[in-house]
């Protein structure tokens, strides 16, 4: 995909394979995996191979110096949705007024050199909580304006490097630091392409891409309507989203809570009793996540019911101790 070799086929294969692996086990769900799936899906429709690619070198497509702004803006909008809804999710009593879970997390990082002593103070957790909320809700807008964009990007880099040191959560920080360069002016990207072209002695045949198909425009509008509605679906569901977790996933609720627990299941059918060893059915990661998430507990109980009926239990009653 990065080299632009058989781009359309490559990005479709990447999107399908990455998303399949991501969705195969819900206990491995991470917001940045979901983000990568969404961006790779959008890239299926974008002419990302029309400049500085092997497809251009092979003559499969002609190089273009300009594309429609809609193809740039869809990536900007997707990034903005991630940040904005992550910030909106932080506007809750526990995050704002209790500084949790940051108070808990930061207290475990006091051993770090240079910054560890600052993390000892309770006020630090409140500063981090408020800044994190304000950063997420406002940074897309500061990045979108030319005057504030350079300063906003510096804040993006500092923010994600800091969170990367304190909370290493995989590739998320790197993805966001690199991804937000899409807000840079076109002249910056042109300079980068020109220097790389000279370095690799890459010759470009320049043309201008035509208008974006109306079908693309309609699709993007529908796509982002769904992207806005999905994070809000919890409003239509009963109960507290932090307890039930209904509507929690796919909603950009990034690092909002800390849960830990254990649960043991008991099967009874008349005089027959059995205590379930969770590890016989689940990996350590699956058992850890299942123990604290209601929908996974219910799913595992339904699995156990089928499992023990297959073993001869006629009417298994399943209870839990947690």
Label the predicted regions.
Residues 124-186, 243:
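Membrane-water interface signatures at transmembrane helix termini and the short loops
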């Amino acid at each position: 995909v990065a080299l632009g070799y058989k781009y359309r086929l490559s990005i479709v294969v990447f999107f399908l394979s990455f998303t399949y692996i991501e969705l195969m086990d819900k206990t491995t769900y991470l917001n940045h995996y979901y983000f990568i799936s969404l961006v790779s899906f959008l890239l299926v429709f974008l002419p990302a191979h029309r400049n500085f690619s092997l497809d251009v070198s092979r003559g499969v497509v002609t190089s273009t110096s300009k594309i429609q702004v809609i193809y740039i803006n869809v990536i900007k909008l997707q990034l903005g949705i991630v940040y904005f809804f992550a910030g909106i999710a932080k506007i809750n009593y526990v995050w704002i007024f209790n500084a949790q879970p940051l108070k808990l997390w930061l207290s475990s990082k006091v051993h770090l050199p240079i910054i560890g002593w600052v993390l000892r103070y309770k006020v630090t957790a409140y500063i981090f909580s408020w800044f994190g909320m304000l950063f997420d809700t406002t940074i897309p807008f500061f990045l979108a304006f030319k005057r504030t964009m350079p300063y906003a990007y510096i804040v993006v880099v500092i923010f994600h490097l800091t969170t990367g040191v304190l909370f290493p959560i995989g590739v998320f920080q790197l993805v966001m630091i690199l991804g937000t360069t899409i807000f840079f002016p076109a002249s910056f990207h042109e300079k980068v392409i020109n220097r790389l072209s000279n370095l690799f002695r890459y010759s470009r045949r320049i043309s201008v891409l035509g208008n974006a198909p109306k079908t693309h425009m309609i699709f993007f509008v529908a796509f982002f309507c769904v992207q806005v509605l999905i994070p809000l679906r919890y409003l239509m569901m009963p109960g507290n989203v932090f307890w039930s977790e209904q509507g929690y996933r796919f909603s950009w609720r990034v690092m909002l809570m800390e849960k830990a627990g254990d649960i043991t299941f008991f099967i009874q059918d008349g005089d027959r009793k059995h205590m379930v060893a969770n590890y016989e059915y689940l990996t350590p990661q699956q058992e850890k996540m299942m123990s604290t998430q209601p929908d996974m507990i219910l799913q595992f109980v339904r699995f156990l019911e089928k499992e023990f009926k297959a073993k001869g239990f006629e009417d298994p009653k399943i209870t839990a101790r947690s």
